[in-house]
């Protein structure tokens, strides 16, 4: 299937462009360019393969129409029932229905691509009838490479003295991302600055999340959604990336932090059990007390610097590597 044109279906993409899915689509565009595979986002143009990235009804219809026309359909499985839970208001109630829906969507394709072996195992447990392969969303390590200018821009913009230690996280205002624990830690650790980048419409989130982000703490900051360039500057300008997520299919922001050579502390959850060895590329914790202790030890230089090993892990998932793997997937189809 080499050199056949790919349609990156853009339907409903506007709804997710500020999420990890939107970032994944941008990475696919970059990977296709690097692999020398022609692609379009215009559905009216001729194509042989279609990439679908969302599970909205228009994507399902597009999948079925493409199949009827003899096109190859690759469905990217970014979502699972497990990472849908504890997200938006009412998500836990409809999670079983969500699982049925995404199973139906994914089964409409010829091949399912999902970011990790962990998410692949989850999907295999759904009884999907199509082959599933794991392929990282990838990371542009060149773009996120650490540099002093980026650090200075971040510190200057938010008027942060060089002596202040800064902890950041990136994500939606949803419980699954660990935002409640992030706020608790800011409250318990007034000597450090905590910045959460990202935004979610307040009408979509439960009251407990609204109350948490409205908490008035002098060291807790919610700058909202910022550009990719500003996120990079934040990685370079901060001292710790704190990723308290309860469930992920990969976590693109984690790859970004690895590429930026920032110390990382994650929640010890199943997806990262095999992906990261504790105290080798990242530090892991399970409770508020453990997070508090590890944050202090990392920021005060009492634990080894793991950033070089973390950076090497990001290089393994560099977009150039992903491009070649995607090309080999096409050739096998």
Where are the regions a protein language model picked out?
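Membrane-proximal helix-turn-helix segments that form the acceptor-binding/catalytic region
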Residues: 93-112
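Short alpha-helical donor nucleotide-sugar binding micro-motif in glycosyltransferases
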Residues: 106, 225-226, 233-238
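Conserved donor-binding/catalytic core segment of Leloir-type glycosyltransferases
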Residues: 161-177, 183-187, 195
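Glycosyltransferase donor-sugar binding loop
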Residues: 170, 193-208
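Nucleotide-activated donor-binding/catalytic signature segment of Leloir-type glycosyltransferases, i.e.
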Residues: 207-229
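Aromatic "clamp/platform" in nucleotide-sugar-dependent glycosyltransferases that forms part
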Residues: 246
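Short hydrophobic beta-strand element within catalytic cores of glycosyltransferases
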Residues: 263-266
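Conserved acidic donor-binding segment of nucleotide-sugar-dependent glycosyltransferases
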Residues: 278-289, 296-302
């Amino acid at each position: 299937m080499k050199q056949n044109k790919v349609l990156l279906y853009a339907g409903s993409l506007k709804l997710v462009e500020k999420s990890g899915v939107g970032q994944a689509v941008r990475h696919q565009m970059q990977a296709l360019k690097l692999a020398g595979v022609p692609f379009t986002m215009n559905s009216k143009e001729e194509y042989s393969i279609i990439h679908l990235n969302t599970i909205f009804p228009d994507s399902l219809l597009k999948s079925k129409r493409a199949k009827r026309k003899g096109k190859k359909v690759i469905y990217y499985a970014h979502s699972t029932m497990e990472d849908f839970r504890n997200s938006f208001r009412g998500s836990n109630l409809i999670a079983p229905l969500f699982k049925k829906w995404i199973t139906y969507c994914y089964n409409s394709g010829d091949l399912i691509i999902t970011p990790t072996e962990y998410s692949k195992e989850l999907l295999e447990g759904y009884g999907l009838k199509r082959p599933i392969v794991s392929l990282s969303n990838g990371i542009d390590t060149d773009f996120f490479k650490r540099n002093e200018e980026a650090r200075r821009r971040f510190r200057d913009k938010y008027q942060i003295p060089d002596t202040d230690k800064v902890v950041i996280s990136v994500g939606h205002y949803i419980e699954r991302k660990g935002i409640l624990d992030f706020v608790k830690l800011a409250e318990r650790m007034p000597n450090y600055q905590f910045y959460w980048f990202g935004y979610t419409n307040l009408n979509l989130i439960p009251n407990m999340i609204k109350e948490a982000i409205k908490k008035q703490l002098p060291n807790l900051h919610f700058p909202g959604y910022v550009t990719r360039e500003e996120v990079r500057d934040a990685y370079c300008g901060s001292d710790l990336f704190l990723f308290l997520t309860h469930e992920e299919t990969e976590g693109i922001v984690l790859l970004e932090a690895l590429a930026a050579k920032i110390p990382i502390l994650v929640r010890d959850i199943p997806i990262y059990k095999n992906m990261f060895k504790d105290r080798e590329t990242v530090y892991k914790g399970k409770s508020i007390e453990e997070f508090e202790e590890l944050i202090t030890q990392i920021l005060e230089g009492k634990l080894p610097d793991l950033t070089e090993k973390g950076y090497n892990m990001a290089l393994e998932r560099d977009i150039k590597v992903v491009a070649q793997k995607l090309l080999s997937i096409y050739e096998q189809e």
